[in-house]
Amino acid sequence: MKKNIQRWIPAAVVPVVIATAAIAVPAVANASPSLPEKSPQQLLELVADSAGTPFSGTITQTTALGLPDVSSLAPTAGGDSASSALELITGSHTARVFVGGATTQRVQVLDGFAERDAIRNGDDLWLYDSDAKEATHVTAPADGLPDAPAVTPGEAAAKLLAAVDTSTTVEVVDTARVAGRSAYELRLTPRDADTLVGSVVLSVDAETGVPLGVAVTAKGQSDPAFSVRFSKISFDTPDANLFDFTPASDVTVEEESVDPAKTPDAAAIATPKPTVVGDGWDAVVVFPAGVPLTDPMIDQLTTKVDGGRVLATSLVSAYLADDGRVLVGAVTPEALQAVAAQ
């Protein structure tokens, strides 16, 4: 993908941290509301039934993985992808989200006076960077467009709930006020002893079932390691004009198209796919050797070990092997090295 797309869907280690580790919850300032009792199964069904609910709102992401805040650092030459990915998992970020339906969504990430937009409207996907004055327009059938990263609490919750199985204890633990709404709090606790994840808490809107916040807390910690929550939300259907995008005359536009019926070339067919070792919360994703990770920031954030380099955080670890493989999981670096040695 081109570099402005990579600012949204980077192709290195860090996006897997977001996808694998998932996301966080709010501290509740208001008194807990009194709500009718619901079982975990009833709440899971409520969340599932909320898919496609129109809404708009402001979300705040806060990360405390033990990494330095790199948001003020300029991307290094040739390192836009890694630098932008690292920005997303350090410090705090604010975004505005608009969902009109299954094929109309807009996410607007605010970076000071600049913004990055991802706008999907049917068969059209626009990726816009106001600072770089660049936009990419992708056209494809709705089911042929690439999946967006897990940005909102709902998207993060969907990934987590899809993975709920016998490796997880699920319980309703409390009620809360989130973005002015009454919510149930559903806690997922891993049974796997080797995972770094202590618990995950979902804040579920009591009326609509839309997830308002998701929180992941690492073992041995009391505060979430990664959090995203709504500070404002409205369930009025957003104006259709919000999903129309016309770039300004000074914006460089790159046109791309995706044809699902097109036969992939030999190189695409031969591209090795990631594999998963183990299952449950201590599963490890192994990415085969690919393009070398050369961004100097990678060296700043990793530690040299036998056979490669490791990125260790409170919630997730990555092992960059000298042979080009990348291993990621919510486990210790030593566990990743053991998998790499198999």
Segments (PLM) and residue ranges:
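N-terminal export and membrane-targeting signals
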Residues: 1-15
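N-terminal mature ectodomain segment of secretory-pathway/periplasmic proteins
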Residues: 2-6, 21-132, 171, 185, ...
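N-terminal low-complexity, Pro/Thr-rich disordered segments
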Residues: 34-49, 62-64, 69-78, 147-152, ...
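Gly/Pro-enriched, hydrophobic low-complexity segments
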Residues: 108, 171-251
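A short, surface-exposed interaction/processing loop segment used at functional sites
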Residues: 126-136, 215-227, 231-244, 326-342
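Acidic/charged, solvent-exposed loop-and-adjacent secondary-structure segments enriched in E/D, K/R, S/T
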Residues: 130-154
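A generic structural motif
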Residues: 141-142, 189, 218, 333
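Accessory, solvent-exposed terminal regions and/or long lumenal/extracellular loops of proteins
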Residues: 242-325, 330-341
